From Swiss-Prot:
GO CC aspect terms: extracellular region
Keywords: Secreted, Signal
Signal peptide residue numbers: 1-18
Places the protein is found: Secreted
Distribution of this protein across tissues and organs: Component of the acid-soluble organic matrix of calcified layers of the shell (at protein level).
Chief location category: secreted
Source species, domain of life: Eukaryota
Protein name: Methionine-rich protein
Chain residue ranges for the region called Disordered: 31-95
Positions with biased composition (Polar residues): 31-52
Keyword check for Secreted: yes
Bias kind Low complexity: ranges: 56-95
Organism: Lottia gigantea
Length: 270
């Protein structure tokens, strides 16, 4: 009697277990065995070494791995970035630097260069070999390159400095008494060099070139050492400080032009 009651109790327990347990239940060991066999993990003839990459790795479908990244990239990395690099940076570059540049420098610039510069140590917009807003000394031979001195600004109502010869007119503001006359020899002596064409500097103290001396006037005109080009006596006066200086161009017939400034004040031509 007791045995029949025990058998009935076991049957009831089996029915309850069948109701609460799904028919497709598998133990963790059974799940891993079935997963590896379906992926081909156990079919390789090589030794079953989990660190041997001569066989395909099992598809474990781990969450949050390689989400949105390229194949082979690290988890959470930007597409195409190297492991350990900042997002979007190039391999081997400093964080935040541009490709091909020195660490911390601007793109396409030499180390220490300012943006827009052309090389190391140059300010923005400066040309190679010249510093911005720098004027040479009385003799500009030291700054000449390929026979041409650096170009300076042309005269304007508020800027009455000398400009480089050859390409731009040069204005020397000198004593305007208009009484002295100089020959070519005198002009050369003022320049301080026998070859007037190779000394690009002004002639301080030369108020007027003698129009009768054709060659002197032509040298002054062509080489631009001390002259006013395309100015006439009716033009407005130039302003330099509190002194108005007007450049006068006179036509002296068949020989050439004469040039002077009609103020009785010597202004240094730099």
């Amino acid at each position: 009697m007791l045995s029949l009651w025990a058998i009935g109790l076991l049957g009831l327990l089996n029915q309850v277990e069948a109701l609460w347990s799904p028919s497709s239940y598998q133990s963790p060991a059974q799940q891993r065995s079935a997963q590896f066999s379906s992926s081909g993990w156990g079919t390789s003839p090589a030794a079953q070494n989990p660190w041997s990459f001569n066989r395909p790795m099992p598809n474990t479908n781990m969450p949050n791995m390689n989400t949105g990244s390229l194949p082979g990239s690290m988890p959470g990395a930007m597409p195409g970035s190297m492991p350990g690099a900042m997002p979007g940076s190039m391999p081997g570059a400093m964080p935040g630097s541009m490709p091909g540049s020195m660490p911390g420098s601007m793109p396409n610039a030499m180390p220490g260069a300012m943006p827009g510069g052309t090389g190391s140590g140059f300010m923005a917009g400066a040309m190679p070999g010249a510093m911005p807003n720098m004027r040479s000394s009385n003799n500009m031979m030291g700054n000449m390159r390929n026979g041409y001195p650096p170009s300076y600004m042309t005269p304007s109502p508020r800027n009455t400095i000398c400009v480089a010869p050859v390409s731009q007119p040069r204005l020397c503001m000198v004593n305007g008494e208009n009484t002295h006359k100089y020959r070519l020899k005198d002009v050369i002596e003022f320049l301080g060099h026998p070859n007037i064409e190779k000394v690009p500097k002004c002639v301080p103290g030369v108020p007027r070139v003698n129009c009768a001396d054709y060659y002197a006037a032509q040298y002054i005109w062509k080489r631009g050492y001390c002259y006013c080009k395309n100015f006439h006596s009716n033009l407005p006066s130039y302003q330099m400080g509190s002194t108005q200086i007007r450049c006068v161009l006179n036509n002296c017939g068949a020989c050439s032009q004469e040039f002077y400034v009609d103020k009785q004040r010597v202004v240094k031509c730099e």
